[in-house]
Swiss-Prot record:
Species per Swiss-Prot/TrEMBL record: Mus musculus
Name of protein: Very-long-chain (3R)-3-hydroxyacyl-CoA dehydratase 2
PANTHER family with a match to the protein in the record: VERY-LONG-CHAIN (3R)-3-HYDROXYACYL-COA DEHYDRATASE, VERY-LONG-CHAIN (3R)-3-HYDROXYACYL-COA DEHYDRATASE 2
Residues annotated as the enzyme's active site: 176, 183
Pathway: Lipid metabolism; fatty acid biosynthesis
Assigned keywords, A-Z: Acetylation, Endoplasmic reticulum, Fatty acid biosynthesis, Fatty acid metabolism, Glycoprotein, Lipid biosynthesis, Lipid metabolism, Lyase, Membrane, Transmembrane, Transmembrane helix
Biased amino acid composition, Gly residues: 12-21
Membrane topology designation: Multi-pass membrane protein
Described function: Catalyzes the third of the very long-chain fatty acids (VLCFA) elongation four-step cycle (condensation, reduction, dehydration, and reduction). This endoplasmic reticulum-elongation process is characterized by the addition of two carbons to the lipid chain through each cycle. This enzyme catalyzes the dehydration of the 3-hydroxyacyl-CoA intermediate into trans-2,3-enoyl-CoA, within each cycle of elongation. Therefore, it participates in the production of various VLCFAs involved in multiple biological processes as precursors of membrane lipids and lipid mediators.
GO CC, one annotated term: endoplasmic reticulum membrane
Chain spans, region May be involved in interaction with TECR: 198-214
Subunit text: May interact with enzymes of the ELO family (including ELOVL1); with those enzymes that mediate condensation, the first of the four steps of the reaction cycle responsible for fatty acids elongation, may be part of a larger fatty acids elongase complex. Interacts with BCAP31. Interacts with TECR.
Family label: Belongs to the very long-chain fatty acids dehydratase HACD family.
Domain of life where this protein originates: Eukaryota
Length: 254
């Protein structure tokens, strides 16, 4: 579940649309890119997703200017947030049919972790929707996704501005911890309401002889951040050094 905030930075190594140009300098990958029809589709997909997250960003700014407060801004962008984040499920299909050379399993984990947070936590536990922690991860996701989908679009067009590449491999240093903090605080805020309502929990006895405690499940998800966060974060730091140093070396030779 820690991948929910790391998606933007880790997906470039496998998991979304336009992964061919996601910072990998492997000549083999570039030669084995998608065909013209698939490339055109991926460009359109990434342009639409970039525009969608820009709509969310503009919605946040407009709501803030209208209210004069950052509290409860979630309600102003709830629908587009759900729509475009759920739209990322197509990225799993892209990997499954082979137009993007990424792991279906890894991509599924990354995408579903965010979809889970949006629908199974924020949507299902309405009491947390006014929490500032929701705004924290929404802002982190919004900036991240605008950069990520822009990165994929320009990469597919073989015209990637350095500023976008730099932003993709630099801003996560702040955005990843910011997103993770927002996610954890949101899940934590949901716990008492989940327990009180028995949300998504299954008690014994029942004909299937099966029980499930959603409250305990959310706690396990929070605990999973402890080993996953540092591993993913330092992996991304390593990727940043590798990708940006390679770019600088390439510029010197030019």
């Amino acid at each position: 579940m820690a991948a929910a905030a790391a998606t933007a930075a880790t997906k470039g190594n496998g998991g979304g649309s336009g992964r061919v140009g996601a910072g990998d300098s492997s000549g083999a990958r570039k030669k084995k890119g998608p065909g013209p029809v698939a490339t055109a589709y991926l460009v359109i997909y990434n342009v639409v997703m970039t525009a969608g997250w820009l709509v969310i960003a503009v919605g946040l700014v407009r709501a803030y200017l209208a209210k004069g407060s950052y509290h409860s801004l979630y309600y102003s962008i709830e629908r587009p947030l759900k729509f475009f984040q759920t739209g990322a499920l197509l990225e799993i299909l892209h990997c499954a049919i082979g137009i993007v050379p990424s792991s279906v399993v890894l991509t599924s984990f990354q995408v579903m972790s965010r979809v889970f947070l949006i629908w199974a936590v924020t949507h299902s536990v309405k009491e947390v929707q006014s929490e500032d922690s929701v705004l924290l991860f929404v802002i982190a996701w919004t900036i991240t996704e605008i950069i990520r989908y822009s990165f994929y679009t320009f990469s597919l067009l073989n015209h990637l501005p350095y500023i976008i590449k730099w932003a993709r491999y630099t801003l996560f240093i702040v955005l990843y911890p910011m997103g993770v903090t927002g996610e954890l605080l949101t899940i934590y805020a949901a716990l008492p309401f989940v327990r009180q309502a028995g949300l998504y929990s299954i008690s014994l006895p029942n004909k299937y002889n099966f029980s499930f405690d959603y409250h305990a499940f959310l706690i396990l998800i929070m605990i999973s951040y402890i080993p996953l966060f540092p591993q993913l974060y330092f992996h991304m730091i390593h990727q940043r050094r590798k990708v940006l140093s390679h770019t600088e070396e390439h510029k010197k030779f030019e």
